[in-house]
Amino acid sequence: MDFNMKKLASDAGIFFTRAVQFTEEKFGQAEKTELDAHFENLLARADSTKNWTEKILRQTEVLLQPNPSARVEEFLYEKLDRKVPSRVTNGELLAQYMADAASELGPTTPYGKTLIKVAEAEKQLGAAERDFIHTASISFLTPLRNFLEGDWKTISKERRLLQNRRLDLDACKARLKKAKAAEAKATTVPDFQETRPRNYILSASASALWNDEVDKAEQELRVAQTEFDRQAEVTRLLLEGISSTHVNHLRCLHEFVKSQTTYYAQCYRHMLDLQKQLGRFPGTFVGTTEPASPPLSSTSPTTAAATMPVVPSVASLAPPGEASLCLEEVAPPASGTRKARVLYDYEAADSSELALLADELITVYSLPGMDPDWLIGERGNKKGKVPVTYLELLS
C-alpha cells in the first residue's frame, strides 16, 4: 500500500512538471527542443496519410452502401463482433417485385413475359452487386480499416510517449539552468569588509548545496536525453513504415479497380443479353403495316399469307430462307438513308439481324411501323435489323 502511494505521488509529480513545462512553452517562457526537419516531414506525411485514408474509407463505404442507417447497423455489428446479416440488394428487390407483378398480371402476356425476363436480369445485377461489395470490402476496406485501427494507433501512442519524453528533457534542461545560475550566485566571493563571518559560512554551505544540485540535475538530464533519443528512434522507425503502408494501399487500390471493372463488365453483359432477348420476343418489338391484300374475309388463309408484305421487324417470325428473301426485297425509303458508325461489336441473334463490328461504317434507314430502337442496316450486299444503341448516326 505504501509502495502504491509513493508511485502515485511520483506520477502526480511528473504530470505536474510536464504540465508546467507545456504551459511555459505555450507562453514562450521556456525553451523547447525542436525535432529535425526530416522527422517533421515524416510526422506531416503520417498525418496526411491518416486523414486521407479516413476520407477514402468513409466515401467508399458510402459508395458500397448509400443507406446511412444500414451503415450504422453494420458498424454496430462489427463493434459487437457479430456477423452482419445478409441484406437484399436493390436489384434483387426490384426483381422480386417484377416477378410478382408478372405472376399477377399474367405471365403469358407480352408484358408479363417481359417482366419475367427483366426480373431475371435484375436478379443477376443484384447478385453481381453483392459479389462486388463483398470483394471490395475484403480487398480494399479491410486493409484501410486495419491501418487506422492498428498501425495508426501504435504510431499515435509512440508519438504521445515521445512528447512526454521531450517535456521531461526540457524540464531537466530548465532545472539544470536554474541550478547553475544559483550556483554561480552562491560561489561569488563575498566582501569581508561588509560580510559578517556568520554569513560567509552560510554562503559557503549554500555553494556546496548548489554544487550537489547541479550534479543531480546533470545526471537527470543525461537520463532524460537517453530516453528521449531512444523514443525518437522508435517513433522514427514507425513513421518511416508509412512508405510500406502506401505500397500496401496501392496494391489494394489495384484490387478495388479490378473488382469494380469486373462488376461493371458483368452488368453490361447481363443488360446486353437482356436486350437481345427482348428483341427476339414476338409481339414485343413488332411493327405492322397496312395489308396490301384484300380483306381476309374474301380470301383464304393461304392466299392472305402469300399476299401479306413482310417487313424486317417481323422477319424473325418467318423461316430463315423467307426472312432473307424478304430483307433483300426491302428498298430504302424515299426520305433517304444515313451513314452510321458502329460503336460495339454485335452478334446477330437470327437471320433477320445484321452482325456488326466496332468502328465500321454502314448505311441505315427506318421503315414505317418499325420499332424506334431498331433500324435497317446495309453493308455491301447484306442487310438486316441493327439496334440503335450500337450506332453513332453521322450527319
Swiss-Prot record:
Modified residues (Phosphoserine): 10, 395
Ranges where the record places region Membrane-binding amphipathic helix: 1-27
PROSITE patterns: BAR, SH3
BAR domain residues: 24-287
Listed GO biological process terms: membrane organization
List of residues that carry N-acetylmethionine: 1
Assigned protein family: Belongs to the endophilin family.
Subunit and partners: Homodimer, and heterodimer with SH3GLB1.
Entry GO MF terms: cadherin binding; identical protein binding
Entry coiled-coil feature ranges: 116-132, 206-240
Keyword entries, A-Z: Acetylation, Coiled coil, Cytoplasm, Phosphoprotein, SH3 domain
Protein name: Endophilin-B2
Domain SH3: 335-395
Gene3D superfamilies, sorted: Arfaptin homology (AH) domain/BAR domain (1.20.1270.60), SH3 Domains (2.30.30.40)
Gene Ontology CC: cytoplasm; cytosol; membrane; nucleoplasm
InterPro entries tied to this protein: AH/BAR_dom_sf, BAR_dom, Endophilin_B2_SH3, Endophilin_SH3RF, SH3-like_dom_sf, SH3_domain
Tissue expression: Detected in skeletal muscle, adipocyte, brain, lung, colon and mammary gland.
PANTHER family referenced in this protein's UniProt entry, alphabetically: DREBRIN-LIKE PROTEIN-RELATED, SH3 DOMAIN-CONTAINING
Main location: cytoplasm
Cellular compartment(s): Cytoplasm
